[in-house]
């Protein structure tokens, strides 16, 4: 599947915490970005050009830049036609089980595969070693990859730029 660089690419960002918001704002300068989240209050904030996180650069971008950014609770609207699905959902570490809870990532990958298997799914969430390979094998695809993030809370947009 080739990407048409003459028109704006649709990118879906799943999750609107520090990682998701910084990616969404950065990419919405030159692409059509849809944020998918489970929290209606966060969706409303994004659709009103307000940040869901405390980050002065993100807040400034939302206030001052012309961004192609919308948010939705509807996974079909978010995934249909997207070239990329960026996964920025929580994977909290459970000290008792000594594991990351990857259920939100797994759910996003399952939904993306069902609704738009052509999209390249890029996992930004923290996951254990080997998890991406197990997802690739489960769905018989090479369109699920991992790209680690190294962002500081409150400086996430700046960290993405640099």
Specify the residue positions occupied by each region the protein language model found.
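NAD(P)+-binding Rossmann beta1-loop-alpha1 motif at the extreme N-terminus of oxidoreductases
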Residues: 2-50
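Rossmann-like NAD(P)(H) cofactor-binding subdomain of soluble oxidoreductases
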Residues: 93-155
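Conserved beta-strand segments of alpha/beta enzyme cores
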Residues: 32, 68-70, 143
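A structured beta-alpha segment of the ubiquitous adenosine-cofactor-binding alpha/beta core
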Residues: 58-83
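Short, well-ordered alpha-helix to beta-strand connector turns
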Residues: 31, 81-82, 141
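N-terminal FAD cofactor-binding segment of flavoenzymes
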Residues: 54
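Dinucleotide-binding Rossmann-like beta1-alpha1 core, especially the glycine-rich loop
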Residues: 156-162
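Redox-cofactor binding/interface segments in oxidoreductases and associated redox assembly factors
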Residues: 85-87, 123
């Amino acid at each position: 599947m080739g990407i048409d660089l003459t028109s704006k690419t649709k990118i879906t960002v799943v999750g609107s915490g520090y990682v998701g918001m910084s990616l969404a704002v950065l990419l919405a300068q030159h692409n059509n970005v849809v944020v998918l989240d489970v929290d209606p209050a966060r969706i409303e904030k994004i659709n009103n050009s307000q940040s869901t996180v405390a980050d002065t650069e993100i807040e400034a971008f939302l206030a001052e830049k012309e961004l192609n950014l919308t948010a939705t609770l509807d996974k079909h609207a978010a995934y249909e036609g997207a070239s990329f699905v960026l996964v920025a959902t929580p994977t909290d570490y459970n000290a008792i089980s000594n594991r990351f809870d990857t259920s939100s990532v797994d759910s996003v990958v399952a939904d993306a595969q069902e609704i738009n298997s052509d999209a390249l799914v890029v996992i930004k969430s923290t996951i254990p070693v080997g998890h991406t390979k197990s997802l690739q094998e489960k769905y018989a695809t090479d369109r699920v990859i991992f790209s680690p993030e190294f962002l500081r809370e409150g400086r996430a947009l700046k960290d993405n730029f640099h």
